[in-house]
Amino acid sequence: MKRIAAELGVSVTTVSKVLNHHADIGPATRARVLARVEELGYRPNAVARSLTLRRTHTLGVIIPDLMHSFFVEVVAGLEAIVSARGYGLLLCASGEDPKKERVALDMLRARQVDGMVLASATATSNTALLRDIAAQGTALVMIDRDDHPRVRCHRVLTDDVKVGRLATAHLVAAGRRAIAHIKGPPIAHSRRREQGYRDALAAARLRVREDRLVEGGFMEADGYRAMQALISLTPRVDGVFAVNDPAAVGAMKAIWDAGLRVPDDVSVVGAGDVAYSDLIRVPLTTVRWSKRDLGGRAAELILDQMDAGTTDRPRRVIIPPELIVRESA
């Protein structure tokens, strides 16, 4: 850095700020420094830099599934923002397993990442660990799932009650009256989507039959099993709101395997608008919210927190949902 500074007639501090993506350097100076850095093939020593700055310029991200298209889009939105500020991502998958989540949290803490973004595993028991991480000053943002209410951190979510209301109200508007709900695991956003389902039925003056609420899960196989149970009810259900799109797709397969038609016999609505929702035999009506915005807003919050060095006022950012009408309902 001293050589570059001397050649360009700027201070070593200026060169350092350019390399560390500080915003208080003018564009002309930044361009000159970066051009000379490129000419010299200069690469900062990451270990030395982290020791000097007390930052690793790495963020840890824990999501339930690295292959799930929903979370792929969330991470893409996150990465687009943080990479522009010189941060890299260290990705971990919990597999919806609290033990794996704990191992990932401990590993990220040992790696001294500057911050963590977490979509919590179902049935997680890691509240105490997360409170400890936040209390030690590691920037923490929770996305998509609103669990661990006692953990002081920013959160980026959708309005899950509205998700349930939009989906169920659409089934009511389509003339369906025996409307079932395939529930998710017992975590906050599943419960809120169920509440939206109940609210929409109440608004339509339709009675909630508890046998039409079947606990499923977030995967296709969960939706398939739940729908098999619902098909056996009398009178037969004529509409289904599934907690997410994979569960809805599984439900549709169970309907077809029973010799019934979607939407003629049973209408189906999902939630999440995953990548293949409009590519299946009967394109899926669903409720959508921007996954890239979810990741992007999480990135902005965690960068702001790291710059400020505190979370005096934890924020809840809500990404609004919207109904996407296709052919399944």
Question: What does each model-identified segment do?
Answer:
Residues E7, V12-K17, T52-M67, H170, ...:
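Short beta-strand segments enriched in small/hydrophobic residues
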Residues T124-A134:
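Active-site-adjacent beta->alpha loops and helix N-cap segments on the catalytic face
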Residues T29, F70-V74, E101, L129, ...:
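Residues at alpha-helix caps and immediate loop-helix transition turns in enzyme cores, especially N-
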Residues M1-H57, A329:
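N-terminal helix-turn-helix DNA-binding module of bacterial transcription factors
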Residues G95-P98, A121-T124, P246:
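Short beta->alpha connector loops
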Residues E39, A80-R85, R109, A134-A329:
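Bacterial carbohydrate/catabolite-sensing allosteric modules
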Residues P27, A31, L40-L118, H181, ...:
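Amphipathic helical "hinge" segments at domain boundaries
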